[in-house]
């Protein structure tokens, strides 16, 4: 599908649930957020229907997210069914890793193509401070289990919420020790993310070069998104940056998002989109559903404008509710 600005949109991120087994400080309050009822979230049959229609329109890659997608029963089974849809080329998963080790075999059987693990620190006490839960040991069990399968693409996503440079050095060191790509993701001012000091790509890169030596740009692409990568001598994996704030990549954006309650939207910043759940439960045909999906794509905003004055169209929900 091509939007009105000429961008090819072939990537759909699907939030399976707004629930999570962690309470990361930049994502939700310690007490959590009011969870949607089972009746409010899309059924797997509804998700599959959307995926089939989206594939017919040109969507080729699906990312399963949350909340934490692995807390919803049957995640691997859904992934397997999505993989079987004609036109779908890749199905990937973003997880906090807590439940990964115990569900990895089912995910591999489903044919999952890649797994991204969200991890912001290697320090158990800092992990507990950021996530407000224990669990670092479980995350590493998941990482080690995934590393036992060399054909599985594994990446670490790290939000620089802890400003101490030793933390950046430690996280990046995973790419030195293992064949893992470590990506630092600039905090976007959405939900609780607005409350934290901003750490930009250049400051993190300077810390890493001081610790590990020169970083050289790598032209290869690893995955579906806008990450740009660097190599470091002696590293088994690459270091990447997703820098939506300082290196705006909206002109190359290739995605739309589906929230767990069935709202499809074109940009993280804005509430603008369409309630696909309401259409389906109202009895729409597949042709009508496809037209609704196409309109979201066609009307995808030209860019985010987080530096501009707030508007009534700005998203008011947090990342766990939108889908990370």
Give the predicted meaning of each segment.
Residues 16, 20, 64, 93, ...:
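Conserved, mostly hydrophobic/aromatic
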Residues 23, 27, 72, 125, ...:
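Residues that scaffold the ATP/ADP-binding catalytic core of kinase and kinase-like folds
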Residues 32-37, 123-130, 190-195, 275-276:
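A short acidic, helix-capping loop that chelates divalent metal ions and anchors anionic groups
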Residues 4-44:
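Canonical Radical SAM [4Fe-4S] cluster-binding loop centered on the CxxxCxxC motif
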Residues 22, 124-125, 248, 274:
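Glycine-centered loop/turn positions within well-structured domains
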Residues 1-11, 176-177, 187-324:
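Auxiliary Fe-S-binding modules of radical SAM enzymes
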Residues 41-64, 71-185:
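Radical SAM/AdoMet-radical enzyme domain recognition
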């Amino acid at each position: 599908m091509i939007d009105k600005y000429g961008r090819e949109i072939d990537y759909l991120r699907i939030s399976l649930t707004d629930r999570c087994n962690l309470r990361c400080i930049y994502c939700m309050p310690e007490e959590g957020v009011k969870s949607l009822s089972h009746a409010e979230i899309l059924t797997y049959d509804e998700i599959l229907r959307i995926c089939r229609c989206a594939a017919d329109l040109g969507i080729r890659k699906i990312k399963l997210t949350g909340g934490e997608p692995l807390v919803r029963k049957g995640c691997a089974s859904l992934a397997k069914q999505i993989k079987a849809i004609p036109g779908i080329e890749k199905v990937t998963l973003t997880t906090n890793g807590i439940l990964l080790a115990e569900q990895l075999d089912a995910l591999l059987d489903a044919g999952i193509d890649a797994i991204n693990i969200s991890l912001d620190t290697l320090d158990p006490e800092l992990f507990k401070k950021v996530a407000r839960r224990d669990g670092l040991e479980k995350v590493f069990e998941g990482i080690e289990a995934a590393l036992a399968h060399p054909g599985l693409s594994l990446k670490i996503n790290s939000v620089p919420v802890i400003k101490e440079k030793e933390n950046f050095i430690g996280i990046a060191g995973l790419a030195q020790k293992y064949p893992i790509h470590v990506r630092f993701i600039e905090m976007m001012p959405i939900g609780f993310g607005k409350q934290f000091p901003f750490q930009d790509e250049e400051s993190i890169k300077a810390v890493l070069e001081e610790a590990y030596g020169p970083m050289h740009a790598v032209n290869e692409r690893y995955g579906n998104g806008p990450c740009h990568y660097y190599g470091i001598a002696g590293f088994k994996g690459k270091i990447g940056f997703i820098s939506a704030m300082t290196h705006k990549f909206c002109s190359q954006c290739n995605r739309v998002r589906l929230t767990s309650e069935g709202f499809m939207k074109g940009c993280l910043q804005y509430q603008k989109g369409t309630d696909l759940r309401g259409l389906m439960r109202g009895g729409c045909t597949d042709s009508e559903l496809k037209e609704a999906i196409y309109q979201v794509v066609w009307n995808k905003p030209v860019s985010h404008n987080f530096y501009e004055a707030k508007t009534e169209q700005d998203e008011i929900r947090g990342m766990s509710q939108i889908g990370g």
